[in-house]
């Protein structure tokens, strides 16, 4: 195509679309259409992805005789949140999950509680009287579960090279827990079901609930009252995730330590503690408001969650006291 033909081609474009076509208007409409499609992509994507999975009747995958039900629950929770529901806390900007905040905080709360349990398994329950060698699978899982939940396959703040994502680390931790539980069923791993081990585990959980309660109280004191609070939902769902995971782990821990629970006549106290955690897990307001704790018009959902949290912690302390006797 020579120069004259090329010029003629471009001069005929307006005639093709009709006389009086405004090229600027076409560009503007195209840009607006693109913006609309991008917004639709994010909004629909967020609606599809978003899920606060707080099923209090959730059951672990079937464990074999001799295996730990609590470990099986930890495995099932990791698998559900990472593989089935999809981990969203580290979604990059071009994915709809990037704009979510409730689900990421909730998922990270769950993983945090599991990591606390894994630490106790490594330090106490997975060893004979705390003096034997640390179990390699438990040690590996405990370390991997501490990995930040917001790391994608690239972390430009540290390096331009690819790195291990949060999902990859948590799946690796899950495989280590599966390996440990399998060896436990085969009789080649330790699960020391002594009362003092249970006591130490409950004490660690209670301490974590205490720090969580302090964070809620501090936030209520500094920003509560008006109901509009952009940080309240982050704190709420992070705490809810922890409490939900603790509820499920403690429910199964009672089965693993059934002889201690029955021998110390803890069943009634244990069930009351579980009920407090269950009530906290079921809190599901459409919008998180942070009004006054005694507000008649604008409630404080953080205060409501904090109430159940403190009650569960108090009941845990009572169980710990009974175990000391």
Located regions from the model:
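N-terminal Lys/Arg-rich, disordered targeting/topogenic segments
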Residues: 1-22
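Hydrophobic membrane-insertion alpha-helices, especially the h-region
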Residues: 28-43
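Hydrophobic single-pass membrane-insertion segments
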Residues: 40-55
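N-terminal Sec/ER secretory leader and immediately downstream segment
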Residues: 54-159
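A cross-kingdom marker for long, charged
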Residues: 58-61, 244-325
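A cross-kingdom feature marking solvent-exposed beta-strand/loop segments within repeated
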Residues: 93-102, 155-158, 224-233, 286-304
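Long, amphipathic, charge-rich alpha-helical segments that form helical bundles/coiled-coils
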Residues: 137-158, 166-178, 269-294
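Extended amphipathic alpha-helical interaction segments
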Residues: 163-275, 279-282
